[in-house]
Amino acid sequence: ILIGLVGSEMCIRDRSYDYYMEGITPHIADIISACDKERVAVCQALGVDALALGDMLVKSYKLEPKDDLYDLIQSIDSYRALRNPTNTKHRFIVEDTMSGLVPLASVGHALGIPTPMIDAFVNIASAVCGRNFWEEGRTAEKLGMAGKTPEEIREMVR
């Protein structure tokens, strides 16, 4: 999602590019890392042991650890052939926002965990796609967590 939104100008121009190799710059990797810290904080608040994205990539792709996420992503050979979405209505943006970012942020809000970076991307995706992903997405309310205490929410995900 983040790559698609930040690279949305290239989507609009219909310029084809390597989604991960060109789409992720060092600065975009920093933004992804900031969002990932929020994801990990929400998971920890739920009592879920979550690996940071970099650690997950090292483990999943059997890579040597790198100093930063950008270098790590650039070292994943299987990412090299993946092309970008051709428009901002692509499932990488729409589905990842509704089913990934909205639940993370919404559950974070219910637990009192701030998610300002994730919130910003949900708002940007909503504006770019002309939709309200806060209403359409999988919110804590839609997941049956409305009015629950943090402990009750943790019990639901165990």
Residue locations for each model-derived region?
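Long, compositionally biased stretches enriched for glycine and/or charged residues
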Residues: 14-15, 21-24
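NAD(P)-dependent Rossmann-like dehydrogenase/reductase catalytic/cofactor-binding core
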Residues: 15, 29-158
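Glycine-rich beta-alpha junction loops
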Residues: 8, 24, 57-61
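Single conserved hydrophobic/aromatic residue that forms the stacking wall/gate
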Residues: 1-7, 12
